[in-house]
Amino acid sequence: MVIDDSNTIRRSAEIFLVQAGCQVVLAEDGFDALAKIADHQPSVIFCDIMMPRLDGYQTCSLIKKNARFKATPVIMLSSKDGLFDRAR
């Protein structure tokens, strides 16, 4: 699953992942992802940090609180490189 508010980033990630043989589910924000996650049960989730409405940290937290998806890897994507952001 790729969660990003940027259509360009979502589509680029989809192209690369499909070429690698992955099935890809796209979500435009955290709420969209939470609505789709139970139906698609992704094996890995790529999540942008900076999104409107529900940011990546909040989205990740909600995913991890669900026992069904607690072990699902969530890879956070960001252009931020500050120490605080890396530690978080």
Language-model features: locations:
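Short hydrophobic/Thr-rich beta-strand motif most characteristic of the beta2 strand and flanking loop
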Residues: 21-28, 36
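Short, conserved "switch-loop" micro-motifs in signal-transduction and mechanochemical regulators
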Residues: 66, 80-81
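Charged docking surfaces used in two-component/phosphorelay signaling
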Residues: 11-19
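Active-site beta3 strand of CheY-like receiver
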Residues: 40-46
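Receiver (REC) domain active-site loop signature in two-component systems and cognate sites
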Residues: 51
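Conserved Asp/Asn-Gly motif in the active-site loop of CheY-like receiver
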Residues: 27-31, 86
